[in-house]
Amino acid sequence: MTTHFLYIEPNTSIEEVKLLFEAHLLSALPVCEGNTFIGVLRKEAVDEEDKETTVADYQYALERFFVPLTATWDTVIEAFASYHTDMLPVINETQQFIGYYYLGDFIQQLTKTPFIQEAGRILILEKSAHNYSFTETSKIVEGNGGKVLGIYLSNRTEDNVHITLKLA
């Protein structure tokens, strides 16, 4: 999480907002009053707008998405996908802006995990959605001299699951 306090306030000019979008290559910026989170302003909401206006003139365009300070990595990934954004504000239980997750930084951190870093082979298994076990799958791999570097469900339907394994 970036604890750099990059946010805009209601009195910030749209001209300054456009410069911030350009300088930081973000698709959205958090809007705060003091440290209190108000919402998120997307770049496309102000792309063609008059530079003489302020963020307060775009209250109608503010969206209210964020992740709590206690969010787990899977919640953060889901939020990035759900909100189609490259920036997720992080707020605490009193609605105070703490920082934000930047999608690029988050992906970079994921690439440092052994699942991505270690050399190995990817194997995708299709199993019954009602009869699969990570433990059983791992035991079969390890019982045959393999080493499981990572395992996750990459797809799920009513009848089947795809289990993606990275093997050493």
Q: Which residues make up each language-model segment?
A:
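Short low-complexity, flexible loop/linker segments enriched in glycine and/or proline
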Residues: 45-46, 58-59, 163-167
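A conserved regulatory-domain signal marking ACT and ACT-like small-molecule sensing domains
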Residues: 119-168
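Signal for well-folded cores of large energy- and translation-related assemblies
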Residues: 22, 81, 111, 141-142
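Histidine- and aromatic-rich ligand-binding microenvironments
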Residues: 30, 45-46, 105-106
